From Swiss-Prot:
GO terms for biological process: protein transport by the Tat complex. The keyword Cell membrane applies. PANTHER family: SEC-INDEPENDENT PROTEIN TRANSLOCASE PROTEIN TATA (PTHR42982:SF1). Belongs to the TatA/E family. It comes from Alkaliphilus oremlandii (strain OhILAs) (Clostridium oremlandii (strain OhILAs)). This is Sec-independent protein translocase protein TatA.
Length: 64
C-alpha cells in the first residue's frame, strides 16, 4: 500500500507528525486526509465512467 516504506519508516513519519502537529491534531488530520482520499477516489471513478461512456458513444457513432 505504501510502496517501499517499511515499518520503521512509517513509525518515523508518524513520530515526526506527532511532534509537528501534536497529539490533539493527529486524529483530526487523519480524518481530513481520509476524507480527501475518499473524495479523490470517488471523483476518479466518475471521470473513468464518463470517459468510458464517451468512448462507447464514439464507437456507436463510428459503427453507424
Amino acid at each position: 500500500m505504501f510502496g517501499k516504506l517499511g515499518t520503521s519508516e512509517l513509525v518515523l513519519i508518524l513520530g515526526i507528525a506527532l511532534i509537528i502537529f501534536g497529539p490533539g491534531k493527529l486524529p483530526e488530520l487523519g480524518k481530513s486526509l481520509g476524507k480527501a482520499i475518499s473524495e479523490f477516489k470517488s471523483f476518479s471513478k466518475e471521470v473513468k465512467e464518463d470517459i468510458s461512456l464517451d468512448d462507447k458513444k464514439a464507437n456507436n457513432t463510428l459503427n453507424d
